[in-house]
Amino acid sequence: MTKRVPILVVDDSKDDVFLLGRAFKRAGLEPSLIHVWDGEEAVDYLSGENRFTDRSRYPLPSLMLLDIKMPKQDGFDVLRWLLTRKDLGKIPVVMFSSSFEQEDVEQAKVLGATDYFTKPAGPEGFDQVVKSIATKWLASPK
């Protein structure tokens, strides 16, 4: 990759965020992973509000990886909010959740999610998810 693509990771699991970062490196990709803990922080980040006002430090992401079940605001709340923001509608949102319930997958798509991946059980699964994300949304992995 010639430039560091900003990817917003919205997830309350530091272990999953770590495994995602490691999987991107193992795939030969080094995007700029920007991590926020919940939907409320994601809305602040995307709006450029509170501590995220400086767009040179906090650029709009080229892709967002969004968990569903989080404190304060969940992923579905973020998707509903995004529907009201035409200026942010072009950011692809990939759901990355531990939920494999078909109802959650369908709800995410109805609310505008671009894709949906279930969180894998181990590091090798994260490698596969990242390769799929890279193939669809980023430069090709090694």
Question: Predicted regions: what is each one?
Answer:
Residues 94-96:
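Hydrophobic/aromatic residues positioned on beta-strands within the core alpha/beta folds
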Residues 21, 35-63:
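Acidic, metal-coordinating helix/loop segments flanking the phosphotransfer/catalytic sites
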Residues 114:
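Short, glycine/charged-rich "phosphate-handling" switch motifs in NTP-dependent
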Residues 41, 121-133:
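C-terminal output helix
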Residues 5-15, 20-25, 33, 64:
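Conserved acidic segment of CheY-like receiver
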Residues 68-70:
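Receiver (REC) domain active-site loop signature in two-component systems and cognate sites
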Residues 35, 72-73, 110:
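Residue-level signal for the "D+5" position in two-component response regulator receiver
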